[in-house]
Amino acid sequence: MVPVIIIPVLNRYDLMERAIRSIDYPVERLIIIDNGDGYDPDMLAWTAPWQHIQNWYLWRMPTNLGVAPSWNLGIKSTPHADGWILMNSYAFFEPGQLEAFYKDCESDSITLTSAMPTWSCAWVGAGVVERVGLFSECYVPAYFEDNDFEDRARRINVEVKVSQAGIIHDNSSTIRSDESLADKNQRSFQENGSLHALRWQSGVPDAGAWDLKRRRDLGWD
């Protein structure tokens, strides 16, 4: 049984529902973090394959937390899990492929999908978080938090595996669906890329810290 699946979502709730409907293997906890505060929880009654999901949580945020804080919130809320599947809201499993992906997951390793981008569906084991820490919340609101975490993990010889399980991903659906988000992402993507390069100039960085000014300057709201 998959211990936890965490799905942050900002818009395109139809694609999030597609992701949930693709769950065809037992999951102990499904955590949906609604950063757009626009999803009707009653719709889950018609969407989710409840025969496979033991418990679900829909957390509606008053503003966009961003990717790293959303993943971290899901991890910190389930500290006794053996690991976590972090899934983009616009990715989905082909039939039988959640089980195939989970078979490639271990508590002391990271498992990525062979689809691009590889972090569109990723497993992070509890042993990895114990060694590496959480995702860096310096990156606002999205992009480079996955690169940063993987780089930190590889530097301390954490195994990073690639699963051949069938996972489909509609890349950048969030920003493609809203022209204003695409415009804001141009700036935040550049700033996050510059920060990523800067953080690694002096060796292996720690997880970093959330910063109010950076959040206000680069957030998409």
Segments from the language model and where they lie:
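Glycine-rich, basic loop-to-helix element that forms the pyrophosphate-binding segment
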Residues: 61-78
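Aromatic-glycine-rich donor-binding/catalytic loop that engages nucleotide-sugar donors
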Residues: 124-143, 152-163
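Short beta-strand/loop segment that forms part of the nucleotide-sugar
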Residues: 28-38, 59-61
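A conserved acidic beta->alpha catalytic loop
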Residues: 22, 34-46, 91-92
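Short beta-strand-to-loop acidic/aromatic patch adjacent to the donor-nucleotide binding site
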Residues: 81-92
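C-terminal catalytic/acceptor-binding lobe
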Residues: 145-221
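Short, well-formed alpha-helical segments that are part of the catalytic scaffolds
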Residues: 11-25
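Conserved donor-nucleotide/metal-binding helix-loop-beta segment in metal-dependent transferases, i.e.
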Residues: 96-112
